[in-house]
């Protein structure tokens, strides 16, 4: 089945939770998990994962719940404590056959051990970022300044990939250990907050490319990935900026985003939420920068630091952008199934040894969205079977060459920037 320019889904409730003509409490918030409807009216505000749970109200949240809480016994205990009732006798979710096959496929993967962590792989990943930091510092020490900064810029991105997997708890399988790895990698390696990232990134996973839900679409004033987002801009200065966004995105916008996160957004979140472990990581990172500035000149060190951040930001943000930003969006009042979000609003980049390493297996973005808690190095093993599942149910399995996907990303930036002009012609 070929891809489409747009998709239409049922508006929530996407599953008929009640018997027809049964009186309902209009302010009650329910969602379905398994064969029960759970009343989350009073739980939404105290949900440990934040308001992401509100995105599932009125829908069958079985797959979302399972994939977000693969390793959390605490979540199951909380779920059992909530008021619930059996779903009515005639209940059937949207795309029931697809959901049933996906859940059966998931059970097969669990039986095969695909969700089990690999400690040797974790050791390799940690050793890699340590070795690359040492190599970058050694290059600079021996006078190869630009080569050393380039190495450190790339490993900054590698820390981003590693913390991403830690934030999904798919490294060691122990939530506390994975969070510790994420805090260290993201704080020391990138100067950012793992707690902030987890809160925001899970919203993206819950509803990728859904307007007013996916935080990855909430990118103004620096960039707009969709015409509907760009249409919000009224300022002539911002319109002028967006008109050049395809040219500015890689060299300038990514740097501004990184600096905004490092110097304002993430430290503010750490202070507000009292994540002192993350603040300690920042203290070590910027203590080292201060030491270097005191001994080698503030201007020189600042210039090197900005180049280092720019290279790392360009590496990671451009690679994140290829997976979704040029694909169709979901309307705010519609809701796709978990599998449809992965199929219709996500693209893979063609596998190869270098692309698998360069994107740290996130070129298998479809598999990652289906199974965010699966160790990412196992995605190549399941990809052919995911494709078969999609083909059986008439879904498009979108795979593009890396450079094709990158070209589509920048073409979309340009099209969005000039959409108002084209409409006037």
From Swiss-Prot:
Cofactor(s) named in the record: Fe(2+)
One GO BP annotation of this record: long-chain fatty acid biosynthetic process
Annotated transmembrane regions: 134-154, 175-197, 241-261, 297-317
Enzyme class: oxidoreductase
Protein name as it appears in the record: Acyl-lipid (8-3)-desaturase
Domain notes: The cytochrome b5 heme-binding domain acts as the direct electron donor to the active site of the desaturase, and does not require an external cytochrome.
Record-stated family: Belongs to the fatty acid desaturase type 1 family.
Motif Histidine box-2, residue numbers: 201-206
Phylogenetic lineage: Eukaryota, Haptista, Haptophyta, Pavlovales, Pavlovaceae
């Amino acid at each position: 089945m070929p891809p489409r320019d747009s998709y239409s889904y049922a508006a929530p409730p996407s599953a008929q939770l009640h018997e027809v003509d049964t009186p309902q409490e209009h302010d009650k918030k329910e969602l379905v998990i398994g064969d029960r409807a759970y009343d989350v009216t009073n739980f939404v505000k105290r949900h440990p994962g934040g308001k992401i749970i509100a995105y599932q109200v009125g829908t069958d949240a079985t797959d979302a719940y399972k994939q977000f809480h693969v390793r959390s016994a605490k979540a199951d205990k909380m779920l059992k404590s909530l008021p619930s009732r059996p779903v009515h006798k005639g209940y059937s979710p949207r795309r029931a056959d697809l959901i049933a096959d996906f859940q059966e496929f998931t059970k097969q993967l669990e039986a095969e051990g695909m969700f089990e962590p690999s400690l040797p792989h974790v050791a390799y990943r940690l050793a890699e970022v340590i070795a690359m930091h040492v190599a970058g510092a050694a290059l600079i020490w021996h006078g190869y300044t630009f080569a050393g900064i380039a190495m450190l810029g790339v490993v900054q991105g590698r820390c981003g990939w590693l913390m991403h997997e830690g934030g999904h708890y798919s490294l060691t399988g122990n939530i506390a250990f994975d969070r510790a790895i994420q805090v260290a990698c993201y704080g020391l390696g990138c100067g950012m907050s793992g707690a902030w990232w987890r809160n925001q990134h899970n919203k993206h996973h819950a509803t990728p490319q859904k307007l007013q839900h996916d935080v990855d679409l909430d990118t103004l004033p620096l960039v707009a990935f969709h015409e509907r987002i760009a249409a919000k801009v009224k300022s002539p200065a911002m319109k002028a900026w967006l008109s050049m966004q395809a040219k500015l995105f890689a060299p300038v916008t990514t740097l501004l985003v990184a600096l905004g996160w490092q110097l304002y957004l993430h430290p503010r979140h750490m202070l507000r939420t009292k994540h002192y472990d993350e603040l300690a990581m920042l203290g070590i990172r910027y203590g080292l920068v201060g030491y270097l500035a005191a001994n080698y000149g503030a201007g020189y060190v600042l210039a090197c630091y900005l180049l280092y951040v720019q290279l790392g930001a360009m590496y990671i943000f451009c690679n994140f952008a290829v997976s979704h930003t040029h694909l169709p969006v979901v309307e705010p009042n519609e809701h796709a199934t978990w599998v449809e979000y992965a199929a219709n609003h996500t693209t893979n980049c063609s596998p190869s040894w270098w692309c698998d390493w360069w994107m740290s297996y996130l070129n298998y973005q479809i598999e990652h969205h289906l199974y965010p808690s699966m160790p990412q190095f196992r995605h190549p093993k399941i990809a052919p079977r995911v494709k078969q599942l999609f083909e059986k149910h008439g879904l498009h399995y979108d795979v593009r060459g890396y450079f094709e996907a990158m070209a589509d990303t920048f073409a979309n930036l340009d099209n969005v920037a000039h959409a108002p002009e084209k409409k006037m012609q």
